[in-house]
């Protein structure tokens, strides 16, 4: 019986060890020196277990073998979980565009069949091709080919006609535009109700990068959205991009530059079906992540290699899983109700934050004279705190909770093999990354002689926007170039050496 038990134990250990090695090689995250160490460790265990069974030390050998089997199983479970998370992060790159058919909230209609005799309209300025496709579906479902879709180019005219409810009784619009219109027309999203929704999915058409991330500089676009449900589907949906960070990374010098562009920046964006016009940067996200990427590439004259979409609401669980983070605040402030139901107070300098505090820190803007500019800097500071904690040895003791949290808040087109290369780079080197930050500056005042901004893509007039300074954009371009060229420097020290004349500082792009 003892011999049979020993043989069964040996078979079990060989099977688990084989699965462990398979997972390790499949993940490809361990540098060569660690692979050699793992194989040597397993070989020694089996040699000791084999030889000790013929000696008086076989009991000690069995005890050690059981302990080592536990270690092997633990490592196998870790590697399996990491493999599962990486596969989840690399879901097919699909954008989901939702089109709504809306009527007034107090309308008696409760289904599409009730709209057979309604007058439909849409805003041709802000809509993509899916809106007309959705209306074709409406006509088909109602079996009324004679239905017409009235065209409006101005939201002022369309909303006025809709509220009057004579010439327009139903609007066909992209779901992502509801919040945009509500920002200009108070409570628009609560004054309407959705009768029908249509979903249209398409593959993201971002060009694949061939950069060698172990040796060559590369650029990642970080897009932050707010989704209360935290579902994977929300990350793939077209939505406003509240956080827009360009991360320039040089693996040779271990430097990262995070450049924040304010969400309300009035710049030329890529809109529906590739159309371009001056609008808010955040609105580009309504037309897919590739529209935001194209917008920032044109603004800075760069090629973005990869993107990461983050559910900022989900950052709560990630920060908590990390055991909290340290955020270095530029200013002292207390956040208001819009940012958090709890009035968290932050001091100038380091602040130890849990998940709720970190999100509140990132959301607040009304407490600052600089408004959206300071919020952008705060968001960058929070991401810097997450990166510093995530690349520290402390994460090893919290791997399970971190992996669980990360899997539901990130969506990326970074290939698993590239992520493996980055992990191997960090494991083989071990040195800390030097994370630098820079935020685009600007003004909310329009240029002399110009009236309120007109948003050419979304068709809104008089919106509150940010006019970026041309010199601030140029400085960001210089900093990105320095990182890519391998220069090792401190951003604050470099900026203090730049002399900017008053006219140049106030020129707008």
Tell what function each PLM region has:
Residues 7, 33-37, 59-66:
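Alpha-helical transmembrane segments of integral membrane proteins
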Residues 9-50:
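Membrane-embedded alpha-helical segments of integral membrane proteins
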Residues 51-59:
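Membrane-helix interface "capping/anchor" motifs
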Residues 58-80:
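Internal/C-terminal transmembrane anchor helices
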Residues 79-92:
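Aromatic-capped interface at the extracytoplasmic side
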Residues 89-90, 94-95, 103-105, 111-113, ...:
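Non-catalytic, solvent-exposed segments at the cell envelope interface
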């Amino acid at each position: 019986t003892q011999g049979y038990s020993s043989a069964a134990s040996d078979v079990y250990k060989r099977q688990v060890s084989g699965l462990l090695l398979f997972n390790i090689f499949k993940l490809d995250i361990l540098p060569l020196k660690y692979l050699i160490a793992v194989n040597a460790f397993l070989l020694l265990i089996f040699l000791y277990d084999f030889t000790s069974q013929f000696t008086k030390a076989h009991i000690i050998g069995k005890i050690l073998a059981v302990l080592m089997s536990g270690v092997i199983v633990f490592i196998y479970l870790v590697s399996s979980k990491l493999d599962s998370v990486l596969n989840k992060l690399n879901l097919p790159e699909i954008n989901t565009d939702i089109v709504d058919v809306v009527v007034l909230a107090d309308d008696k209609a409760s289904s599409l069949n009730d709209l057979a005799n309604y007058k439909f309209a849409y805003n041709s300025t802000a809509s993509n091709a899916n809106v007309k496709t959705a209306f074709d579906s409406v006509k088909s479902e109602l079996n009324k080919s004679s239905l017409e879709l009235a065209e409006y180019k101005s939201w002022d005219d369309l909303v006025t006609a809709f509220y009057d409810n004579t010439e327009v009784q139903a609007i066909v619009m992209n779901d992502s535009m509801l919040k945009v219109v509500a920002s200009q027309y108070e409570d628009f999203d609560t004054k309407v109700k959705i009768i029908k929704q249509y979903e249209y999915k398409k593959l993201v058409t971002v060009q694949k990068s061939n950069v060698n991330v172990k040796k060559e500089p590369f650029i990642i676009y970080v897009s932050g959205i707010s989704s209360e449900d935290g579902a994977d589907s929300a990350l793939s949906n077209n939505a406003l991009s509240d956080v827009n960070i360009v991360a320039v990374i040089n693996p040779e010098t271990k430097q990262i530059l995070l450049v924040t562009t304010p969400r309300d920046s009035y710049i030329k964006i890529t809109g529906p079906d590739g159309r371009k016009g001056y609008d808010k940067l955040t609105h580009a996200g309504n037309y897919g992540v590739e529209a935001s990427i194209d917008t920032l590439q044109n603004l800075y004259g760069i090629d973005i290699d990869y993107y990461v979409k983050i559910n900022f609401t989900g950052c709560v669980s990630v920060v908590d899983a990390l055991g909290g983070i340290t955020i270095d605040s530029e200013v002292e402030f207390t956040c208001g109700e819009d940012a958090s139901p709890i009035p968290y107070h932050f001091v100038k300098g380091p602040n130890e934050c849990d998940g709720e505090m970190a999100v509140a820190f990132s959301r607040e803007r009304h407490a600052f004279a600089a408004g959206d500019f300071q919020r952008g800097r705060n968001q960058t500071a929070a991401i810097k705190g997450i990166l510093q904690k995530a690349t520290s040895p402390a994460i090893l003791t919290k791997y399970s909770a971190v992996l669980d949290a990360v899997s539901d808040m990130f969506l990326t087109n970074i290939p698993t093999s590239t992520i493996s290369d980055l992990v191997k780079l960090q494991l083989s080197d071990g040195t800390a990354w030097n994370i630098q930050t820079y935020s685009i500056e600007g003004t909310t005042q329009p240029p002399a002689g110009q009236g309120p901004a007109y948003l050419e893509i979304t068709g809104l007039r008089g919106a509150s926007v940010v006019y970026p300074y041309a010199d601030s954009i140029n400085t960001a371009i210089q900093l990105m170039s320095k990182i890519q060229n391998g220069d090792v420097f401190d951003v604050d020290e470099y900026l203090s050496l730049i002399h900017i004349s008053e006219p140049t500082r106030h020129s707008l792009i």
